[in-house]
Amino acid sequence: MARIIDDNIKRQLSKRMDFFLKYFPVRVRNVGEDAVAARQLIWDFKDARDNAFEKVAQMTAKHLIQVCGEKIKDIVFVCVPASTQAKNESRYKAFCNRVSELCGIINGYPHISVSGDRLAIHEHRHDKEKSLSKTQVIEFDEAYFKG
């Protein structure tokens, strides 16, 4: 089984991954103003506030043109769906339309639907912590080896 996981991880890591902003969670406090601004833009985009989608769409379209060139007209642009249909629509509908307008990529948004709501990833953490408290945990660290 470990071999399959290793191969899957290798395949995932071999994929091209690009990012425009470096995100630091709020718990990381020692960050510069640029990181705070990036965090705010990400939150604004996810919450569909202040037309943040326009700035992100322009960054995305510019990058896609650089990476794909003329082939862009034959590529379908699809976003990984949000946790609910309402969040998916507020976050991606205008964004995907705008990216398509700016660079000519095919808009795949109309072909994606959220079939059922689920908790957002950050809303899962509390459940895991509660279920962990019902078990016995042995913490293993270097303290066991200090004489």
Report each predicted region and the residues it spans.
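Charged helix-capping and loop-helix junction motifs
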Residues: 91-97
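Short helix-loop-beta junction
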Residues: 97-105
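Active-site-facing substrate-recognition patch
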Residues: 1-76, 84-86, 114-147
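N-terminal accessory nucleic-acid engagement/regulatory domains that precede
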Residues: 75-79, 91
